[in-house]
Swiss-Prot record:
Family: Belongs to the PMP outer membrane protein family.
SUPFAM superfamilies per the UniProt record, alphabetical: Autotransporter (SSF103515)
Sorted UniProt keywords: Cell outer membrane, Cell wall, Membrane, Secreted, Signal, Transmembrane, Transmembrane beta strand
Domain of life: Bacteria
Protein name (database record): Probable outer membrane protein PmpD
Autotransporter domain boundaries: 1244-1531
Signal peptide: 1-20
Keyword Aminoacyl-tRNA synthetase appears in the UniProt entry: no
Main location as per UniProt: secreted
Subcellular location: Secreted, Cell wall; Cell outer membrane
GO cellular component: cell outer membrane; extracellular region
Organism of provenance: Chlamydia trachomatis serovar D (strain ATCC VR-885 / DSM 19411 / UW-3/Cx)
PROSITE patterns reported for this sequence: AUTOTRANSPORTER (PS51208)
Length: 1531
């Protein structure tokens, strides 16, 4: 380089205006004009002085001399015959040229095999030197350097196998180097230099408007190792080298250090070039490298260098508006420790810009440092029209495809974008930031992928930490940076099978199988689906101390605040907002034990948001088959401090697994919100300790405002699978070829182990026996206790204001809360001032807990909560029902309330029902279990028309009276609307509180027992007792539980004494006590409860049981015998015959046996008995009640039956009305045959045979005020009929047909229906004699009827029977031609007719099955009807086409009707009566429209529509429609 400074300047005139036009700007290069010399066209060459212009047609050979032997200003290229230079002195050589060189290229120029590397100071084959010490200013000079200008289509330059020891073996210029309009193409092959620029070296290079560029196998041997790539990335250049340092500063027409390739219309290829010890395997530039508006493919293939395997530049590198770009097999071989930056294909200290190109493919590029394909300060890929593909790129450090220091922007591309098969230590696809692997701080950058139109995919990228790499962060299988945004893209976004394999390091952030961001991850406003599938974060073995001293065991590795996880995404804040469908499927996370020790937070099989995760406003969200495995790993699908799922069209978390908490998701610090979504589903998720579906360790789970159904189904929290899985992983190290299969099967094995653990002890025998187990250690016992929340684990759970049903079904937990657990499993996890609570409020749909369970463990008896385990439970303000069905647990089949907890239930707009819940500890029925000594019930409230229903027992672990608790209020006066029912059925409930019924009713039904320490009833409130029910007052002085003596409270009931003349039953412990145990004024006894058809023997009276020795003061008691269901008098077993009904029994309990209260005390009571009135609408047994008497401590009343009043819904009208419907089907078929098969049109073809078929249907409604005594019905039927008829003689037709149909009848007043299916067979005939048309037919039908009748609380019955019907008809019609209509092929007929119809329908006797069963004797209905009518026909005939349209009006009169049989008996009541069908009007008015069209002599179609009503005077009692359509084939 130093020798160049000794060469003096050589210059020639070159138009400034032309160069300015060429080089004005990148965007202007496409419109450059021809180059000029001295103002003349290049076609008019002007030679000045010695000929320094290359005249290609005169070249015979080249004279090459030593650079050192040349005088100042002499040239390397000399034109002439070599013989003319022999034996001549140097001074005979062409003289000095005053200006630089301009070469006009007309024909191909080929230089080959010039080797000057043995000359120490050999320069390029064609050289231009400029002195750096010119006295005169150079600003005025037109052009400096070398320019080649093509002058024809053949103009081409080929430089092959040219070698030199200095820079630019083929072309060297200390100034500019320009190629213009070289239409024969440029080729540089196998050129090499021991310094920079294996082929060309210049201050700047422009290749413009040339026909292609081929650069192959050029090399530079210059050594840049050890120098900082940041100082001079543009040092090297296997083929081209451009730098501004060759001649110092000057006023440049093209910026120094730039290389521009523009507007070329041929292929551009750089292949096999190398700078093995420098940068830029093909091109190295100290300035910019620009490829602009080239029309054909530009490719860089298998180039290699330390940094920038193809291109290295200290400033920007841009490819704009080009055709297809291909970067394949390029390699940056320099390592970071040797100062190399990387960039397997491109490396830049400025911005790498790929814009407006027709396609980009980067394939199999590699870097031993960063950026397998591209490295730059910034990287922008935008506005490209064709696909952008990065495939199988590899980097040893960051960015398998792209590494940038500040920003990577991929925007506004028109076609698909794909990153596939990349590999790196971090950022397998893209890494953005300034990284340090030596323990220094890393500054991360931003990745923005937005507003692209095509699909975007990242697949099969891999991060494998083969060494420590950068220390602060590890991961990002596809993308790695500080802030990552994917927004407003129009195509599908796919992240598939991206994998991160890293080892743990103290205090770091590890993971993100697809994306790792230390700041925000924003995926927003994308128009098409987004899927993360098969991404993974898996551990690698830790490096040894010898390999990496940073892991010195002497320093220790304490727990840190590091984070690990995110099988798909790991970011500090993750926001997935307002997208189309979002899917996370089969993503997985595996963490080693070492990693769990080193890092403070591990988890998120799909997503780990270190601070927060928001998934809001997406059309649908699905997390399926994700898992997070390893010690202490939570969030099978999602882990974050706070989680928000809001405003999504649907949310689905299914089959996710975590080895610690949150099988689906975990919020580790704050709340988890499921708000304002559509359909929400959590199904088949598995967790080990905290929450099979959701874990929220320190916050609330809020399920609020969702517009669709919310379901938690088949989620499991169980421990036992983990030990098995870990052992398998540790014991067996699979072969490399088996690893992928093992990963795929891991999820299935883990799930099966969950199911096995969940089933192993769930089903115990009814007596509670389990197989004996060996004793276990306290440590193991403590470990077993830590499992809760089959669906949800949280501090508090709020289920509020949802619009559709919220369902928890078949969820399972080992220990606590089969569906929901709130609270803490460890003392150290409890938060001051935060009381565990479940709130269910304001929901419009039903809230259902069904089939949930927690396992029985004999070593942990004080556990449970089949559906819910909490401290406080509040259910209020719901307009839907809240249902607890068939849940099971060790204790608290439905709900377990922990000590100091309370329950507040309000049936507001729906019922609250506990049914079928059971527990092992209660040995059966168990609705709510109250643990400890302080848990209690605050209030049970129900609004009018609604109820709280306990089919199962309320169970208290400790029956010591709750002295500190308030009285249990039933329907508190705080709300006047609390007038509903609190209902206990079947089970025995012991409530260690005093009960105060202030409004509404408390009902003990179906043998229920309710025990309490006191009972008070306010005026207006009801106490309803059914037969066998017991209201029991617990004895405060009697031990009721092992180790507990009960003491009497001092103030349970508000009244302290009984005022004189009070109207109530007032019972105290003894005569001296002024506080009552019982204060009741009215007892209502349910009449319907005393007996049923299944009961036998003596009826047990309702009981009021008080402690032995209790004192009854005088007072009045009203006892109402009530008909609560309105069907009390339908109690056949009780009221069918004379009976004594025990209304009430008063019993005193003692230590040994129950005894009656003293006769004296009972006789002092003034009991007023009121029996239910028999009103006009009271149905059932009629009779008289006697005066009530007390007999042996029991209040008894007698019944004397006098008769039975039949409920109209039992009259059986629907059975008899089915006879009418039987005839209706036969009549509809008859009318269709008369209208379509027996017509004058049919008679036109003598001796023809017709095969026909049609569909038919009808609808009838029969009801009227004057028919109210017998139930009306709505009937509908539909079917198909087919037949054949033949014309035996002229105008005589005989035919047969068959039909099948389905139908249904519904009662108009009652809940009864009949389903019908039947068949019909018919024969028919017609004879046309002049104007007279005779028609006749006979039909026989059979119908199978299936009836179901529902009687509400009385049950339902069903029956089946077969009915039959016969219909015979004869009709005579007179056809009168009114006259032809113009044109003459129209004809109009007026046809009056009369008909006689005989119908007979019957059914055999049958008996119903079920409750309120009836027996029907056989019955029949026979009638004769005479219809009269007229028909208007308009016929159109033209050739073989014939169409007849008709309008018929008829009036039918029923001349004869007879109903026979019909006796009905209500079997249980022993009551019979005569049934009958509706008394329909005997007139019927019909209007029919019909069309018969013969399209040819072979084919005909038919269509008919009929409407009818019940005559002129009763049109509202009978209304119906019939329709038919079909075709005829004529033979």
């Amino acid at each position: 380089m130093s020798s160049e400074k000794d060469i003096k300047s050589t210059c020639s005139k070159f138009s400034l205006s032309v160069v300015a036009a060429i080089l004005a700007s990148v965007s202007g290069l496409a419109s450059c004009v021809d180059l000029h010399a001295g103002g003349q066209s290049v076609n008019e060459l002007v030679y000045v002085g010695p000929q320094a212009v290359l005249l290609l047609d005169q070249i015979r050979d080249l004279f090459v001399g030593s650079k050192d032997s040349q005088a100042e200003g002499q040239y390397r290229l000399i034109v002439g015959d070599p013989s003319s230079f022999q034996e001549k002195d140097a001074d005979t050589l062409p003289g000095k040229v005053e200006q630089s060189t301009l070469f006009s290229v007309t024909n191909p120029v080929v230089f080959q095999g010039v080797d000057q590397q043995d000359q120490v100071s050999s320069q390029g084959l064609i050289c231009s030197f400029t002195s750096s010490n010119l006295d005169s200013p150079r600003d005025g000079e037109s052009f400096l350097g070398i320019a080649f200008v093509g002058d024809s289509s053949k103009a081409g330059i080929t430089l092959t196998d040219v070698k030199a020891s200095l820079s630019g073996a083929a072309l060297y210029s200390t100034e500019d180097l320009i190629f213009e309009k070289i239409k024969g193409g440029l080729e540089f092959a196998s050129c090499s230099s021991l310094e920079q620029g294996g082929a060309c070296a210049a201050q700047s290079i422009l290749i413009h408007d040339c026909q292609g560029l081929q650069v192959k196998h050029c090399t530079t041997a210059v050594n840049a190792e050890g120098s900082s790539a940041n100082d001079h990335l543009g040092f090297g250049g296997g083929a081209f080298f451009v730098t501004g340092s060759l001649s110092g500063e000057k006023s440049l027409y093209m910026p120094a250090g730039d290389m521009v390739v523009a507007n070329c219309d041929g292929a551009i290829s750089f292949e096999g070039n190398s700078a093995n010890f420098a940068n830029g395997g093909a091109i190295a530039a100290s300035g910019k490298v620009l490829f602009v508006a080239n029309d054909k493919k530009t490719s860089f293939i298998e180039n290699r260098a330390l940094s920038g395997g193809a291109i290295a530049a200290s400033s920007d590198i841009a490819f704009q508006n080009c055709a297809e770009l291909v970067f394949k097999g390029n390699c940056a071989i320099g390592t970071e420790d040797k100062g190399s930056l990387g960039g397997g294909a491109i490396s830049s200290l400025g911005t790498v810009l790929l814009q407006g190109n027709h396609g980009i493919t980067c394939d199999k590029n590699e870097s031993a440092s960063q950026g397998g394909a591209i490295f730059g300060k910034n990287c922008q890929i935008s506005d490209n029209e064709g696909p952008v593909v990065f495939r199988d790129s590899t980097a040893c450090l960051g960015g398998g495809a792209i590494a940038a220091q500040e920003i990577v922007s991929i925007q506004n591309n028109q076609a698909g974008i794909s990153f596939e098969g990349g590999k790196a230590s971090f950022g397998g696809g893209i890494a953005c930031g300034s990284f340090s692997s030596a323990g220094g701080a890393s500054v991360l950058g931003t990745i923005d992928i937005s507003k692209n139109l095509g699909a975007i995919s990242f697949s099969r990228t891999l991060c494998t930490t083969s060494d420590l790499g950068q220390m602060e962060y590890q991961g990002g299988g596809a993308l790695f940076g500080e802030n990552i945004s994917l927004s407003e893209n129009a195509g599908v976004l796919t992240f598939k099978d991206n994998i991160v394999k890293t080892f743990a390091s103290n205090g770091k952030i590890l993971g993100g199988g697809a994306i790792l961001a230390t700041g925000k991850v924003e995926i927003t406003n994308n128009s098409e689906g987004i899927s993360f599938t098969g991404n993974a974060r898996a551990p690698q073995a830790l490096p040894t101390q010898e390999e990496f001293p940073l892991f010195s065991k002497k320093e220790g590795r304490p727990l840190s605040s590091g984070y690990s996880g995110g099988g798909a995404i790991l970011g500090r804040e993750v926001a997935i907002l307002h997208n189309a469908a979002v899917v996370f499927e089969q993503n997985r996370l595996q963490c080693s034990e070492e990693e769990a020790t080193l890092l403070g937070c591990c988890g998120g099989g799909a997503v780990h948001g270190m601070d927060s995760t928001s998934i809001v406003g997406n059309s649908s969200v699905r997390f399926g088959n994700n898992y997070a495995m390893g010690q202490g790993v939570s969030g099978g699908a999602l882990l974050s401090k706070t989680v928000q799922l809001a405003g999504n069209g649907s949310v689905d978390f299914s089959r996710n697994i975590a080895s610690l908490g949150g099988g689906a998701l975990q919020a580790s610090e704050g709340n988890c919100e499921l708000v304002d979504n559509g359909y929400v589903l959590f199904r088949d998720n598995r967790g080990r300790v905290y929450g099979g579906a959701i874990s929220c360790l320190r916050g609330d789970v809020v399920i609020s405002g969702n517009k669709g159904r919310v379901e938690f189904k088949d989620n499991i929290a169980t421990r036992l699978y983990v030990e098995e899985t870990v052992e398998k992983v540790e014991e067996v190290e699979p072969a490399p070829e088996q690893k992928d299969n093992n990963e795929l099967s891991f999820l299935g094995r883990a799930e099966q182990s969950f199911i096995t653990a969940a089933n192993q002890a769930l089903f115990a025998s009814e007596d509670g026996d389990l197989s004996p187990e060996s004793s276990i250690s306290s440590e193991e016992l403590a470990k077993r206790r830590e499992c809760a929340g089959g669906a949800i684990f949280a501090k508090r759970v709020r289920i509020v204001d949802n619009q559709e049903a919220v369902v928890f079904s078949n969820n399972f937990s080992d220990i606590y809360g089969g569906a929901i657990f709130t609270g803490s499993l460890r003392e150290e996890d409890k938060l001051d001032g935060q009381i565990p609570e479940v709130l269910i409020s304001g929901n419009a749909g039903d809230v259902v807990f069904s089939g949930n369970s927690s396992k029985r463990d004999e070593h942990l008896p004080h556990t449970g909560g089949g559906a819910i385990c909490t401290q406080n439970l509040t259910i209020s303000q719901n307009t839907g029902n809240v249902l607890f069905y068939n849940n099971v647990a060790c204790s608290g089949g439905a709900v377990r309330i922990e000590d100091h907890g309370n329950v507040l239930l309000e049936a507001f707009g729906g019922d609250i029902v506990f049914k079928g819940n059971s527990s092992f500890r209660a040995q059966g029925s168990d609705a709510i279990y109250f643990a400890g000594k302080e848990s209690h019930i605050t209030a049970l409230n129900a609004t009018e028309g609604h109820a709280i229903v306990f089919h199962d027992a309320l169970v208290f672990e400790n029956l010591e009276e709750r002295k500190s608790a308030e009285v249990l209020l039933i329907n508190s006066r705080e709300n006047p609307g609390y007038t509903g029912s609190i209902r206990f059925l079947e089970a025995e409930s012991k409530v260690p509180q005093c009960i105060h019924v202030q409004q509404g009713s408390l009902e003990l039904l179906n043998g229920a027992t309710l025990c309490s320490y006191g009972f008070k009833q306010d005026a207006g409130a009801k106490l309803v007792l059914a037969a066998g029910a017991k209201l029991k007052i617990l004895d405060s002085g009697t031990p009721v539980q092992q180790g507990h003596a009960i003491s009497k409270p001092e103030a349970e009931i508000e009244s302290s004494s009984e005022p004189e003349g009070a109207h109530s039953l007032w019972i105290a412990k003894n005569a001296q006590t002024t506080v009552p145990m019982v204060d009741i004024h009215t007892i209502s006894v349910d009449l319907a409860s005393f007996s049923s058809s299944q009961q036998e023997g003596t009826v047990e009276a309702p009981q009021v049981i008080v402690p032995g020795g209790s004192y009854v003061r005088s007072g009045e008691l009203n006892l109402e015998l009530v008909n609560t269901t309105g069907t009390g008098y339908e109690n056949h077993a009780l009221l069918k015959n004379e009976a004594k009904v025990p209304l009430m029994s008063f019993v005193a309990s003692g230590d040994e046996a129950s005894a009656e209260i003293s006769n004296l005390s009972v006789s002092d009571l003034q009991i007023h008995v009121v029996t239910p009135e028999i009103e006009e609408d009271t149905y059932g047994h009629m009779g008289d009640w006697s005066e009530a008497k007390i007999q042996d401590g029991t209040l008894v009343i007698s019944w004397n039956p006098t008769g039975y009043r039949l409920d109209p819904q039992k009259a059986g009208a629907l059975v008899f009305n089915a006879l009418w419907e039987e005839g209706a089907v036969l009549s509809a078929l008859k009318n269709a045959r008369f209208a379509h098969n027996l017509t004058a049109q049919r008679m036109e073809f003598d001796y023809s045979t017709n095969v026909w078929g049609f569909a038919f249907g009808g609808f009838r409604t029969l009801s009227a005020e004057n028919l109210v005594a017998i139930d009306g019905y709505k009937g509908a039927y539909g079917g198909a009929s087919a037949g054949v008829d033949i014309q035996l003689m002229e105008d005589f037709v005989l035919g047969v047909s068959g039909a099948a149909f389905l139908g249904k009848m519904d009662s108009q007043k009652f809940d009864a229906e009949v389903s019908r299916k039947g068949v019909v067979g018919s024969v028919y005939t017609g004879f046309l004699a002049g104007s007279w048309f005779f028609k006749g037919q006979y039909s026989l039908g059979e119908t199978q009827n299936d009836m179901k009748t529902r009687y509400g609380v009385l049950g339902e019955s069903s029956a089946s029977w077969t009915s039959r019907g016969v219909l015979a008809d004869a009709l005579v019609e007179y056809r009168s031609l009114v006259g032809p209509v113009r044109p003459t092929f129209y004809a109009l007929h007026f046809n009056p007719y009369v008909e006689v119809s005989y119908a007979s329908m019957k059914f055999p006797g049958f008996t119903e099955q079920g409750r309120e069963a009836r027996s029907f004797e056989d019955a029949s209905l026979t009638n004769i009807t005479i219809p009269l009518g007229m028909k208007f026909e308009l016929a159109f005939i033209k050739g073989q086409f014939s169409e007849v349209n008709s309008l018929g009006i008829s009036y039918a009169w029923e001349a004869y009707r007879k109903v026979e049989g019909g006796a009905v008996q209500l079997l249980e009541a022993g009551f019979d009566w005569e049934g009958a069908p509706m008394d329909l009007p005997r007139q019927e008015l019909r209007v029919a429209l019909e069309n018969n069209t013969e399209w040819s002599s072979y084919f005909s179609t038919v269509l008919g529509l009929t409407a009818f009503c019940g005559g002129f005077t009763s049109t509202d009692s009978k209304l119906g429609y019939e329709a038919n359509t079909g075709l005829r084939l004529i033979f």
